[in-house]
Amino acid sequence: MEKFYTSLGLMSGTSMDGVDASIIRSDGESNYEPIFDKYFEYDGVIYSNLLNLRDKINSIKDLQDNSYQINELERKITLFHAKISKEIIKNAGVDVDIVGFHGQTIFHNAQEKISKQIGDGNLLSSLLKKNVVYNFRENDIHNGGQGAPLAPIFHNLLINQNKIEKPACVLNIGGIANITLVISKNNEDLKSFDVGPGNCLLDEWVRRHTQMKYDENGKASNLGKTSEVILNQAIDNFDNISNQKKLSFDIKDFDLSFVKGLTYEDGLSTLVDFTAIIIYQSILKSINSEENKKLLIIVCGGGRKNLSLMESIRKRLPKNIYLKIIDDYKVDGDFIESQAFAYLAIRSALKKVISFPNTTNVKKPSIGGVLVKNY
């Protein structure tokens, strides 16, 4: 019988607004149980510092030139993670065996073989007196992969544990949207890749025009009118990028210049349809669904709450492909990524594979993450 471990997963996405924290129990294989989830918002100083730093980092040289600021912010980020880890462990009333610490991505460029997350695993281990796994992406990149996406094996676990009929597809709409196609229980049969922008362009447009961080439920975009001319040109331009066969994206791969002259609401509406079409096209291209074969798309991530975006995707799909949100299966769609890194931490500690050729383009199934015990 496999041993079960209690693991805390800490994940901060491209929105840079806070940390999702999840405690789970799992054997690192086909069994898992969610125990406790909570979101912790960054304070205003950390949030603004992260946004400012990300704006400065566009190359490896920029990482070197801003090393002092990066190191200072890394310490603040780690102290914040230590504080919230102690809080969630206390709230959950459980002892944790291991912590999966993703850190905050400030630069990701698969072509240049780099994915930089800030977060000091050694310091976190010392502060928590816990084993910590961090630096999840480096080994995948070292072995020829793109370092992302890493959640597919957890998506596979969710599909199988909830007895969802296969083939099924998990569509995660975070800052970047990614897809996992599950056709069997075998992790090596998984197919996964980044689609393109998820919430990132929408959120950036909102931040530039308002004091808000996102368009709640897509309400503002519903007030606007999409510019079809601008939309079609933007889709053509994106197709040229995607034809380079990139499996992973960074938000720096996209910009808002094509909607610059539009009103706030019209810009949002155009961006919603742009994002929806990219997702729709990727579903059709990658899945090769047979004309009369039903295929379920299960949506997770913050984008599932944007009703305007969801409707824009749904109305374009053929009748044999249909959408459901993961919450319909009594799984909290806000914490899939943090639960995934709790699960990956267990697998990493057990020296189990976390990425595969069809998920990250890595040359061979690869382990990942660095395990530290600094106490």
From Swiss-Prot:
GO terms for biological process: 1,6-anhydro-N-acetyl-beta-muramic acid catabolic process; amino sugar metabolic process; peptidoglycan turnover. GO terms for molecular function: ATP binding; kinase activity; phosphotransferase activity, alcohol group as acceptor. Keywords: ATP-binding, Carbohydrate metabolism, Kinase, Nucleotide-binding, Transferase. It catalyses: 1,6-anhydro-N-acetyl-beta-muramate + ATP + H2O = N-acetyl-D-muramate 6-phosphate + ADP + H(+). Its EC number is 2.7.1.170. It is an enzyme of class 2 (transferase). Belongs to the anhydro-N-acetylmuramic acid kinase family. This is Anhydro-N-acetylmuramic acid kinase. It comes from Pelagibacter ubique (strain HTCC1062). The gene is anmK.
